């Protein structure tokens, strides 16, 4: 049942579950004219537990239709994170089955556009007899399927190949590398083009130990030949997809139209879950973002552009300190002494052009996403202001 507090905090253009708990986006795939967003879901309450796959579909990535639970927890285990692929008329989900002592990779098939799934009777399809081995991302590479899956505590992403999604053959490993202060989770690997050159981007989520002292997602730019991922540059420090505290476990859509690479993340973090108000639903997704590449100095870096218009835009003179705010909400701006943009205590490096920075802000009830117009630097935060706050942007020096 909807309440006043639900109305106050439920975003208008970010995805939220109809009710109960949600975390990682799963099984992102475009199939027969619909974007499918599956997600980690507790059907029975607003706290984490009974992990199953919730489900929603959209034709534009902003307006979503809630559907029934797609894959439910059963006596064999909980349904943890994974991915989905489109094969003809079918959607095949590849997910981690979790028990207290073992995590294995399993598959389930839908013949009705993702509305219902049948679990493969010979699951699991990949079992290393490990307590922590999870989050398979599967995609097509030439004439075979590739799986990226992590050994979280070893800080390793493992690659496998398969012809039929059932029999998997080991290919290679990547890691440990860059940030290893927490467990590795939710890998994704995909191609993007820069100036006619195909490059591959590997995403690895980290919990905790990210730049914001909590959860976050690092990325690597490199090459992939169907066997091995090789970074393009020496790995001297992590590169972060987002500098805020609330963008974790994100993934990209398989088979998005026109070859677009579209990302959605979980707009929360594991260190600060107690701050969510007592609504009938818990947590939201980030705004969908189209990914690309650009060059900063001598390195090629990731860019993100939202699939909606900004709420506010700021042109900042970088010779001066600039502070703006949403009254009683958050403070944001630019500090010329550090050359960083900030939202409250979270910062991101920027490179001014002609002493100017063009910032854009998405504000949606209980979230703020600040980003540079080139899409290189982002700060994402879930925030829960008190009732009566106007959420209007104002300058205060």
Model-derived regions: residue spans:
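Beta-rich accessory regions
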Residues: 1, 195, 218-397
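Surface loop/turn signatures of beta-propeller and other carbohydrate-active proteins
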Residues: 1-26, 45-48, 62-86, 114-140, ...
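Structural WD40 beta-propeller signal
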Residues: 31, 87, 139-141, 190-192, ...
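Entry beta-strands of beta-propeller and related beta-repeat scaffolds
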Residues: 34-37, 89-94, 144-147, 196-202, ...
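Short glycine/acidic-enriched loop and turn motifs that connect beta-strands
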Residues: 42-46, 98-101, 152-155, 207-210, ...
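Beta-propeller blade signature
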Residues: 52-60, 105-113, 159-165, 215-226, ...
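Carboxylate/His-rich catalytic cores and anion/metal-binding grooves
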Residues: 81, 90-125
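Conserved, charged catalytic cores of large soluble enzymes
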Residues: 143, 149-158
């Amino acid at each position: 049942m909807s309440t006043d507090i639900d109305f106050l905090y439920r975003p208008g253009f970010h995805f939220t579950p109809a009710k109960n708990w949600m975390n990682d986006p799963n099984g992102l795939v475009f199939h027969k004219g619909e974007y499918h967003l599956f997600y980690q879901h507790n059907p029975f309450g607003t706290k984490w537990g009974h992990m199953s796959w919730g489900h929603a579909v959209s034709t534009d990535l902003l307006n979503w239709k809630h559907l029934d639970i797609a894959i439910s927890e059963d006596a064999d285990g909980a349904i943890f994170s994974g991915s989905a692929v489109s094969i003809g008329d079918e959607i095949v989900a590849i997910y981690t089955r979790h028990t207290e002592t073992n995590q294995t990779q399993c598959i389930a098939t839908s013949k009705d556009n993702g509305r219902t799934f049948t679990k493969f009777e010979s699951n699991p399809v990949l079992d290393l007899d490990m307590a922590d081995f999870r989050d398979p991302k599967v995609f097509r590479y030439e004439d075979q399927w590739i799986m990226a899956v992590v050994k979280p505590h070893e800080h390793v992403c493992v690659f496998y190949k398969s012809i039929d999604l059932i029999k998997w053959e080991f290919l290679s490993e990547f890691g440990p590398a860059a940030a290893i202060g927490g467990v590795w989770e939710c890998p994704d690997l995909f191609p993007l083009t820069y100036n006619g050159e195909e490059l591959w981007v590997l995403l690895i989520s980290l919990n905790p130990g990210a730049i914001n002292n909590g959860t976050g997602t690092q990325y690597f730019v490199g090459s992939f030949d169907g066997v091995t991922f090789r970074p393009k540059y020496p790995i001297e420090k992590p590169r972060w997809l987002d500098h805020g505290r609330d963008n974790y476990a994100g993934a990209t859509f398989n088979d998005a139209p026109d070859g677009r690479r579209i990302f959605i993340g979980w707009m929360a973090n594991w260190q600060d879950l107690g701050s969510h108000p007592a609504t009938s639903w818990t947590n939201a997704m980030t705004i969908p973002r189209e990914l690309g590449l650009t060059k900063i100095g001598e390195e090629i870096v990731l860019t993100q552009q939202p699939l909606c218009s900004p709420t506010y835009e700021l042109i900042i003179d970088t010779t001066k300190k600039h502070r703006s705010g949403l009254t009683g909400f958050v403070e944001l701006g630019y500090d010329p002494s550090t050359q960083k943009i900030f939202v409250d205590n979270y910062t991101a490096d920027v490179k001014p052009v002609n002493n100017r920075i063009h910032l854009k802000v998405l504000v949606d009830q209980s979230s703020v996403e600040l980003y540079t117009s080139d899409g290189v630097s982002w700060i994402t935060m879930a925030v829960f202001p008190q009732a009566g706050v106007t959420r209007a942007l104002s300058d205060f020096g």
